[in-house]
């Protein structure tokens, strides 16, 4: 079992690197068992909140931690015998069985999820934005769609009764353009595409409904020519919406002439509007060109002004100076002399103030250079010490690696041994199946022979019974046959009892071997020590209670 224990230790070290490796599982302490099992359960079921260490204080806490881990193993599907004793008094056989089960239950994609988590931490802002957009769209697609007529549903109450109030009032002045684009001019089409409100915008208010407005518009188009004028006036009593295309009133002279057809009148109006629109567009272009030219001239003028202003200011100052030249020259000479003397004074003051500062600066530079040199020397010494320590550690690790490579079998050796174990198991399974087949064949043969013997016995018994009525020798032979049959039955019973006893003996031997492997003596010693700790704790509590009672009695 040494190879199995090494494989288990290797898997546990991958799960939790803080687990101290041991040569065998029998050397595991209760603290190591708790850490290993809790680490495996944390990988299998991350939702479980289990303690990772075994407290070293009161025994009640240790029992609680062990019981919670045992319950977690049972919830994970472990069907073996497990309890707090498995963790507080570990047994190599039971512990090996438990750890093998937990290692088999470890998720295979654990490494993949770690890589995925590291990749998710390096996502760009664009990828995060795309992920957020996908999440928002998926959430919006899951929300139910509410029709337009049900979005303004209110709950009305009247005289103790409640009902849903849904408004279906139409928009009387609904403007629906024609479906044929050839009937519209270019300007009308541009207006409809860019500025005209659509059906949803015209019925967006809560007082009108889209379906009712469309139906009302269809009825008006259908029956508008048939209804009387009074009805149409009543229908259009509300405030009319502005039409999409303004109408043009005909001149007064045209009214006196013969009234043209409606189509001709509309075409004339459209033609007139088109001419007006073209004229307005031409005027607009001309005005735009003029405005651009004026803006360009304005820009040039501003640039010229900004360029001339410095020269103008200089000329103004020069003219002021030349107005009284002698007096201004005397003032300038006096100002120049005072400025020179002031400059000399400031230069002398600056030199007097600068000299000690330069000396202190040189001293500080020298001190800083010396400090830097000393720091470099200290860092060099520290690096040399670290280099020696790293070299020594490197040599120790090399020695450890050589010893480990010599003492531990390589991975290929483990794989080869595992394949050998699997081959032996398959061979044993084949042998077991062969023994079972032989047992079945033998059982069939025994059943056949038993049936033949039973038939022979019945036939012989019938013949001898018929002959015993007339022959004394046949009567004696019949008695001997009955005695032989009874003796044979006793022999069969003895053989069956012997087989059962042998089977029970083998089961007891296996159970004895299992109990020997459990180290019952060591477990009993640990339990005895824990009981003594409990007794000491109980005595301490009793003494504390007596002290409190005496204090209360004295007071």
Curated annotation (Swiss-Prot):
Keywords: Coiled coil. InterPro entries: CCDC22 (IPR008530), CCDC22_CC (IPR048348), CCDC22_N (IPR048349). One of its GO terms (molecular function) is cullin family protein binding. GO terms for biological process: positive regulation of ubiquitin-dependent protein catabolic process. The keyword Coiled coil applies. Belongs to the CCDC22 family. This is Coiled-coil domain-containing protein 22 homolog. The lineage of its organism: Eukaryota, Metazoa, Ecdysozoa, Arthropoda, Hexapoda.
């Amino acid at each position: 079992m040494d190879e199995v224990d090494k494989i288990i230790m290797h898997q546990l070290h991958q799960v939790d690197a803080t687990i101290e490796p041991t040569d065998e599982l029998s050397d595991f302490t209760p603290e190591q068992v708790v850490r290993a099992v809790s680490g495996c359960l944390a990988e299998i079921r991350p939702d479980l909140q289990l303690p990772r260490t075994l407290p070293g204080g009161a025994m009640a806490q240790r029992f609680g931690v062990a019981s919670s881990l045992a319950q977690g193993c049972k919830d994970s599907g472990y069907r073996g015998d497990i309890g707090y004793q498995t963790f507080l008094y570990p047994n190599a056989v039971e512990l090996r069985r438990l750890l093998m089960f937990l290692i088999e239950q470890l998720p295979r994609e654990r490494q993949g999820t770690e890589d995925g988590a590291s990749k998710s931490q390096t996502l760009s802002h664009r990828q995060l934005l795309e992920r957020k957009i996908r999440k928002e769209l998926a959430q919006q697609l899951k929300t139910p769609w509410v029709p337009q007529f049900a979005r303004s549903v209110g709950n009305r109450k009247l005289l103790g009764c409640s009902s849903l109030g849904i408004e279906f009032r139409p928009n009387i002045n609904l403007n629906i353009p024609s479906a044929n684009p050839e009937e519209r001019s270019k300007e009308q089409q541009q207006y409809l595409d860019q500025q005209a409100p659509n059906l949803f915008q015209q019925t967006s208010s809560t007082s009108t409904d889209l379906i009712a407005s469309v139906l009302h518009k269809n009825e008006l188009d259908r029956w508008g020519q048939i209804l009387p004028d009074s009805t149409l006036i009543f229908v259009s009593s509300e405030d009319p919406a502005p039409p999409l295309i303004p109408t043009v009133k005909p001149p007064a002279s045209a009214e006196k002439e013969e009234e043209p057809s409606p189509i001709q009148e509309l075409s004339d109006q459209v033609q007139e509007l088109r001419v007006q629109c073209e004229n307005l567009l031409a005027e607009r272009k001309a005005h735009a060109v003029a405005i651009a030219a004026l803006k360009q001239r304005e820009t040039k003028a501003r640039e010229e002004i900004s360029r001339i202003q410095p020269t103008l200011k200089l000329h103004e100052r020069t003219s002021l100076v030349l107005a009284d030249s002698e007096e201004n020259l005397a003032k300038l000479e006096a100002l120049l002399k005072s400025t020179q003397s002031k400059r000399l004074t400031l230069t002398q003051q600056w030199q007097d103030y600068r000299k000690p500062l330069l000396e202190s600066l040189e001293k500080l530079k020298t001190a800083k250079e010396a400090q830097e040199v000393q720091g470099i020397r200290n860092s060099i010494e520290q690096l040399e010490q670290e280099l020696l320590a790293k070299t020594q550690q490197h040599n120790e690790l090399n020695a450890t690696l050589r010893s480990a490579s010599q003492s531990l079998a390589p991975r290929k050796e483990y794989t080869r041994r595992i394949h050998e174990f699997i081959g032996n198991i398959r061979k044993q399974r084949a042998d077991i199946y062969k023994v079972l087949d032989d047992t079945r064949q033998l059982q069939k043969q025994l059943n056949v022979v038993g049936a033949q013997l039973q038939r022979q016995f019945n036939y012989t018994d019938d013949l001898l019974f018929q002959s015993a009525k007339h022959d004394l020798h046949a009567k004696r032979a019949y008695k001997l046959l009955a005695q032989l049959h009874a003796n044979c039955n006793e022999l069969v019973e003895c053989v069956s009892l012997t087989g059962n006893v042998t089977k029970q003996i083998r089961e007891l031997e296996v159970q004895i071997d299992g109990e020997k492997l459990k180290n019952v003596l060591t477990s009993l010693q640990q339990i005895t020590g824990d009981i003594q700790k409990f007794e000491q704790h109980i005595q301490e509590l009793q003494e504390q209670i007596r002290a409190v009672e005496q204090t209360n009695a004295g007071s």
